[in-house]
């Protein structure tokens, strides 16, 4: 056997959504910012992402992150998020997974009852706080990036569902937020094929019609996914939502950055008051909580700083190899 690459990972899930943390095996990443390092990876070593996200090592809905050195003085480490289509700007479920792993595995100095974890991401610095009893990590809350409504009541035309109206909001990534009830889209596992078709059509139409650009981070310049909300299954939940993102990927968690954007959307529309908590349910029934910490501005756009809370669990450790003689060296996808 001729091993051309060996990679080590920690396998975590957040509310059911996989997050594969790559801890070793990457080349040294040039660049003074996480965005620059991500750009270098995309141009020079994208086969690593494909090997870890695609079958047979991964699957069409796989998600993960590369650990890298921090770029800001208060961060413990940096992360580059990756998925089936490429690389993302933010990943709230990934922040929760990374923070849990960092505390459980001793990557940071642990304190009782809560341990702080600082993470540099493409969207900026994220500060998380992990409950720690001296033996086990518990729920994680993180202070999200400034979040805001970019456009209200915008419409797109789709091939299968006609005209769809919603808001475009930002919570670390841009999403098109829409009510699923008028389209008979329950947020349940049994409806996943219809949810995927709807979400993919809306995302494609929205990106074609609305050229979004973050006012302070010009590299964030596309609509990452569609978030479809409807009635929850649990009495204590405010809503359920399903995020269809990247290349028709379905988030099993309630979506961390999407929850941040939803908090901003509801607050700026007067639906969620200061001090209220959004209990956001996923397609599999797991829950994130979100609330507004304070108001702020992003350029000339009114925004809020949300806090998002959820839980993650380590479910494995793995060593992966790439054998250049393998005809499926860097993987494939079957949808």
Curated annotation (Swiss-Prot):
Protein name per Swiss-Prot or TrEMBL: Trans-3-hydroxy-L-proline dehydratase
Active-site residues, as the UniProt record annotates them: 91
Keyword line: Lyase
InterPro entries assigned to the protein according to its UniProt record, in alphabetical order: Hydroxyproline_Metab_Enz (IPR053425), Pro_racemase_fam (IPR008794)
Transmembrane portions of the chain: none
Coiled coil: none
Annotated family: Belongs to the proline racemase family.
Native species: Burkholderia ambifaria (strain ATCC BAA-244 / DSM 16087 / CCUG 44356 / LMG 19182 / AMMD) (Burkholderia cepacia (strain AMMD))
């Amino acid at each position: 056997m001729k091993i051309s690459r060996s990679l080590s990972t920690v396998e975590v899930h957040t509310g059911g959504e996989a997050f594969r943390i790559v801890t070793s095996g990457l080349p040294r990443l040039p660049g003074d910012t996480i965005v620059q390092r991500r750009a270098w990876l995309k141009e020079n070593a994208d086969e690593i992402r494909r090997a870890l996200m695609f079958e047979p090592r991964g699957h069409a809905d796989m998600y993960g992150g590369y650990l890298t050195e921090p770029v800001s003085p208060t961060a413990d480490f940096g992360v580059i998020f990756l998925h089936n289509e490429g690389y993302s700007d933010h990943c709230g479920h990934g922040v929760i997974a990374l923070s849990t792993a960092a505390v459980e595995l001793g990557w940071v100095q642990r304190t009782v009852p809560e341990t702080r974890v600082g993470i540099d991401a493409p969207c900026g610095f994220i500060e998380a706080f992990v409950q720690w009893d001296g033996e086990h990590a518990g729920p994680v809350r993180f202070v999200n990036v400034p979040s805001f409504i970019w456009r209200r009541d915008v419409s797109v035309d789709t091939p299968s569902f006609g005209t769809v109206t919603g808001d475009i909001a930002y919570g670390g990534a841009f999403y098109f937020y829409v009510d699923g009830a008028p389209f008979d889209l329950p947020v349940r596992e049994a409806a996943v094929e219809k949810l995927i078709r709807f979400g993919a059509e809306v995302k494609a139409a929205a990106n074609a019609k609305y050229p979004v650009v973050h006012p302070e981070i010009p590299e964030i310049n596309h609509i990452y996914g569609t978030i479809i909300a409807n009635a929850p299954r649990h009495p204590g939940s405010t809503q359920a939502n399903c995020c269809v993102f990247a290349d028709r990927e379905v988030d099993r968690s309630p979506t961390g950055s999407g929850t941040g954007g939803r908090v901003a959307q509801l607050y700026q529309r007067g639906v969620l008051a200061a001090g209220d908590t959004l209990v956001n349910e996923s397609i599999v029934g797991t829950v994130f909580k979100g609330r507004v910490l304070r108001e702020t501005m992003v350029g000339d756009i009114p925004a809020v700083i949300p806090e998002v809370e959820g839980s993650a669990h380590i479910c494995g450790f793995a060593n992966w190899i790439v054998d250049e003689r393998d005809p499926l060296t860097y993987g494939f996808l079957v949808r």
